[in-house]
Amino acid sequence: MEKDRSFTDEFEKAISTKYRLYLWSRFVKGIKEYKLLSPGDHICVCISGGKDSMCLAKLFSFLHKHSDFDFDITYLVMDPGYNKKNLDLIKKNLKTLRIPAKIVKTDIFDIANAQTKGSCFLCAKMRRGALYNIAKSMGCNKIALGHHYDDVITTTLMNMLSSGSFQTMLPKLHSSNYPGMELIRPMYYIREKDIISWAKYHNLEFLQCACKFTEEEADTQNAGRRKFVKQLIYDLKKEIPQVEKNIFKAPDNVTLDMILGYKDNGEYHSFLDNYDEE
């Protein structure tokens, strides 16, 4: 997937040298293994302002230069109503990383808070819908998000503990509400600690929670649960060193005749359906 060895800046050089094994190689592995990109794709790389999406943007910038097939990229910052301080930080980092992003202003923070005060779920849903709408209007057929390996295993365990379901965060999925649009997660194999290391190596400062309604109470219910599960995984690792790998692998290692039931296209199937046929 590479053809040009030259570098545009120090960030590209670090991606290809110091962080080649932990960022670049795993980025390319995820794209190849899950077939996330095809010739002629127009990718909307979504930038929230945090470390993950900024790292994703720089990886895509490097990939666009080194790929052996043509595809287009649009870098998008969907501004849901950031305060000036946060927006200025995003702009500063975009300039530092040489990411030519388009910033599209919306009023999602205000609208979501007016409808259901402090509703992170509603805000996230509205932001996702806005991303699809904006990306489609720009001619994109895929949107890329900065979820990583640790997000995947945390989400998998959260679903089991909080909702009694066995679901994971997929590397790609078709949009049910926006025909022809697809969501991809190219950093599926990248560990959060390596993104943090990359940011520290370059002395970069990124947004944490940028919601102006939770700045004084950043630990919302969902954020609190996610933090708890991440700590739980950390603690489990002390006794089970392979626990992260095992959680990640579990959704890819399901034996259907050893589970009570599953859903397929919304229809429930029980192990009893064919139990007496044997």
Task: Please report, for each region that a protein language model flagged, where it lies by residue.
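Long, contiguous hydrophobic alpha-helical segments, chiefly transmembrane helices and signal peptides
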Residues: F27, M187, F248-P251
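The feature marks non-catalytic terminal segments
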Residues: L204-E278
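Catalytic subdomain that performs nucleotidyl-dependent activation
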Residues: I73, D151-L232
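Short, solvent-exposed coil/turn elements at secondary-structure transition points
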Residues: D79-G81, D107-F109, S175, Y189, ...
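Catalytic cores of large soluble enzymes that bind and process phosphate-bearing ligands
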Residues: I15, Y19, C123, M187, ...
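ATP-dependent adenylation/nucleotidyltransferase module used to activate substrates
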Residues: E2-M158, S162-S165, L170, K193-Y201, ...
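Short, basic, helix/turn surface patches
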Residues: M126-M138, K172-Y178, Q231-A250
